[in-house]
Structure formats: structure tokens, C-alpha cells
Amino acid sequence: MRSSWADSVANAEESAPATGAAPTPVANHQNSRPTRSAYVPPHLRGQAPTTTAAPAPAPGPAAVQPSASVQPSGYAAIVGGSRWAGPASGDGTGAVGGPRQSVGGRGGGGGGGGGWNSRPGWDRRDREPNPFANSEAEEATEVDFDTANTGINFDAYEDIPVETSGHDVPPPVNTFAEIDLGDALNENIRRCKYVKPTPVQRYAIPISIAGRDLMACAQTGSGKTAAFCFPIISGIMSSRPPQRPRGSRTAYPLALILSPTRELSVQIHEEARKFAYQTGVRVVVAYGGAPIHQQLRELERGVEILVATPGRLMDLLERARVSLQMVKYLALDEADRMLDMGFEPQIRKIVEQMDMPPRGVRQTMLFSATFPKEIQRMASDFLADYIFLAVGRVGSSTDLIAQRVEFVLEADKRSYLMDLLHAQKANGTHGKQALTLVFVETKRGADALENWLYTNGFPATSIHGDRTQQEREYALRSFKSGATPILVATDVAARGLDIPHVAHVINFDLPNDIDDYVHRIGRTGRAGKSGLATAFFNEGNLSLARPLCELMQEANQEVPQWLERYSARSSFGGGGGRNRRSGGARFGGRDFRRDNRGGGGGGYGGGGGGYGGGGYGGGGGYGGGYGGGQGSTSSWD
């Protein structure tokens, strides 16, 4: 008999790493300038600051280092006094003793509004340094192979269906030993404690090793990063080193990996560095929001693999500090959103108008969780004789993500959210709040909701496109560590991020596109662990009713009768548009060439299965923690 979601996540939380564990207390760093107040994380605001001075420890790659001392409790009691750990000044800015001009501040409702930079305690001196500022220290530091190693429940993935389209598709592999990746890379795979390939890796790696172009559709969290990094690193190691111009300050990478966001670029860079450890393949990252001179210094020291966002890469190309004429491998991660969210002109200019070798000469790999037909047509301009690979959605054939839709009026969303969070905390292990990701549509909405959650006793942080890179990295570290277990985010900011142990995704504002919904709920139920996705639906989401109903039916979820009625109403208009889903059940896309010419290869059928009931276990449906037991470790990105 199927147990409730609350039971499964509670059992898993006992065996999995405790993300909500209290962080080690950090000594308060005294600021030499009394006119600046120290930044205090949301869960500690209102507490009396510590007066004991002590040297601050060196920042680690995943350490959260607030200026105020960190308390062992998961929550900070709301007490009297200023939220920002300092008395308000007469000029209304909240700065102590000085008329500091805030930047990007917003007034308004929602618990006080206010942008991140309007917070008086957040000064540039308090921010984390650029993680890539000290290149010598980076090279000397050993790579931590266990950072993202959280354990995989492989039983949940045995029957995931896979489809391939195209001619002469290389056969899949079952073990890494079947692939000639080179001794150094194989050693790094062992260091990462990867046991066997994930479904997307079983197919994508042989296809890429064979030199074929690839369009791969697989859910975030299914191992896409390793699927394109392994063949790239192996190919660079086995090829003859190119002759680069001597005395030039221009960098000539052999591989280019593009991603839509800064955080995803940093994430890919960290993973690629692990895989390239002691191989002689140097990986460099370049993204906006960080000092460009630091990145230029890294590029001057040599680069084989360049991970970049489109905007920063265009800047480097226009400065003639990067040349693409030696690029042999081009990979686009989250390719559908890069082509759909305004990056298409930049991507076309980079690929077609700069000095990059043309398609057919270079090898191109496109990866994403969804590939609608219109995006496939656009992306096919960059590919030559490619193979289309579709890996079944995790959650469409296994009991991983329980989807729940509630009808909530716009005016009632906040009170309903509070009820969910209270129930989740009460049912969580040791009364701790499970990691919860709340999606909203606008940057202003993210700021307002974060402030409102804080004023109601919930430690929360937020991330969106107006944050500086340091602020976004700090917020992510605070969320991952459990210091602020509620993260309010917009789509773009959280795109493609690999955040382990997210127990609950709440669509506070539903997106306009069903593919965005698929990407959002993919933040939970990762690596074989169970998760819960809750959506707030009302009359404003009528266009999403039909595709949402179809998606839940495909996943064997219980569809509310009221949602079926809304779905029927929206069907009278003919449906279609962006929300007419391609690919049918279980896949984020289907090769559009099949519809054009009726062809298409075979592939691995896989089992099927389903969610197995879709119940929520009564009142415990919002229990804390994360599901799935510990299993064999593998290369999930």
C-alpha cells in the first residue's frame, strides 16, 4: 500500500543529510566604520548583535558567513527593534548616522517592499568576494569531489522511457567502463563516486563520442552536465593540442558551453572542474555581474573549456579578448529558454556571425528539459544531421513528484501560503521547516513576498534578476544550508539550478506557459527523491487549465473536478498556442522532424508505471524533509 508523502519524506529525512541543521556559530566581524551597520540574514533580524570581536574565518565555497553571529535555532524569534539590526536614521533610509543613498529600493506594500540594495546593512564591504578573484588560490586548491554528492535512488529510474530519432544512432551503454573516456577522466569519475550512467548519459555520451550533433530533452537533475562534459573533456584530451598564436592576449577556447544565467554557469563550471581535474584541460567561467578584469586574467592564463553567459561572451568577443575560431565543441544548456527568452539574437550572432567554425565542422550539443516544436525549428539552424534524444520525465513514470492544485483567489494567496508553511513546519522532522521554493512572476513580487514572510516569522530570502551576483550567491548558500529554508524566486533566476533536497515547490503565481511549469516543479523530486509541487490556480490562469490537466493526467495524478471543468471551458476556444504541448505523455518534447516526414528511429521503450495513486496522506501531505532513500551514487548534475 502506498504510504503518504509525509511518511516517505519523514523517513528519508532521517537517513539523508540534515540540510536544516544549525550552522556553526560565526564570530561577529567588527566594522571599523561605525556609520555602517552589518548585514543580518533574514532569520536573525531583530536579535541583539554580538559584541565579541573575533577574526572572521576564510570563506569556503559553500559557507554562509553572515556578519552577525549565527544562532543554533532554525528560527529567530521576532522581537522588538529594527529589522535591519540598527536604529533607523532620521532621513528614512535606515542607515546608522549617515544619509546613505539606497539604490534600487522600492516602496509599496507587501510587508514593506524595498529592493535588496535598499537594505542599509548590505554594504559592498560586507559582500562575499568574487569566487574567482584569486586565480592562484583556485588552482592550488584541491577540488572537492563530494560537494554535490547526495546519493541516488536508482530504483526510481530503472524504467524511464527513452526515444531517439535520426539515422545510425550509436547504441547506449550500461556502464562507464564501456566508454573509452581516458584514464584521467575515468579516475575523476571514480573520485566522484559515480557508479553507473543515468538514462540521459547512457545515450548522450556514446552519441557525442561518435561526433554526432545532438538535441537532448531531459529533465533538470537527470545528469545533463556530465552528459556533455564527459565527451568534451575526453575529446580535448585525445586530440592533438592546437597551435595558438604566441604573444596574443586573446583566448582561444576549444569548447564553449553557454547557459542563460550566472548561477547555472557557475554550477556548470564547478562540475566541469571536477571532471577535468588533473587532465590538463583548463575550465574558465565568464558571466555578467562580476568584475570583468578578474575573468580576463583567468582567460589570459589559458582556457580549453569556456563556460559563459551570452551577454558576457559578446562583451569579450567585441573586446577581442576571446576568439572562437578554434572551437570544436559547442554546448547549450537550457537551450530552449536561451532561444525563447530574448537570447536568440545574441546566440545567432555568436554562432553564425563571429569566427566560430560552421555547423558540420564543429560539434554542437543542445540540452534542455523541454523542446517545443517552434524552438526545435529555431535550434535546428545550429545543428547538422543531428540525433534527437528524449528522456522520459522523472515524475511521469515514477512516484516522485506529487502534484497538487488548489483554487486560491489572488487576495487569499498569502494567507493560504502561511497555512501551508505552518503545516509543513509542524509535520517536519524536529519541527524544522523543509526547504521550500516559492515561485512568483515578478521581481517586485519576490521582494514584497520575502518581506511579508519575514514579518510573519518565516525565515526567507529571495533571488531575481535585479540582485547583484554576490547577493544571489549569498541567498543561494543561505537557502541550501537551511539558514533561510524558504526561497522566493522568479523563473529566470532559478533556471537550471541544481539545489539538492528541495522538498516543496509552490507556484504562488502560475506561469503562462506549461513548459515553465514543468521546469519549476523539476526543482523537487530530484535524483530519485520524493517531492511535492503545489500550485495556486484562479481565474487568471484559465489558459493553463487544459495543459495542466493533461500533464497531471499523464502523470497519473488526481485531477480536481473543478480543474477539469475549467479545462473543458478553455477547450471550446480550440486551445493551442504556446500551451499546446508537444511530445505527448512522459516527454518534454518530440522530434518535430517526425511530423514533417514521418521518419524517426527507435529507441529504448522502457517500462511505464505511474504515480501509483497520487494520494497525499491526509493532513500530513505537507510534511517536512525530502523523499527517497539513500542509494547508489551517480552523476546527476
Swiss-Prot record:
Motif segment (DEAD box): 333-336
Residue spans of biased composition, Gly residues class: 104-116, 598-610
Domain Helicase C-terminal per the UniProt entry, residue ranges: 416-567
Spans annotated as Disordered: 1-68, 86-141, 570-610
Ranges annotated as spanning the membrane: none
UniProt domain comment: The Q motif is unique to and characteristic of the DEAD box family of RNA helicases and controls ATP binding and hydrolysis.
The protein's name: DEAD-box ATP-dependent RNA helicase 37
Source species taxonomy: Eukaryota, Viridiplantae, Streptophyta, Embryophyta, Tracheophyta
Gene designation per UniProt: PL10A
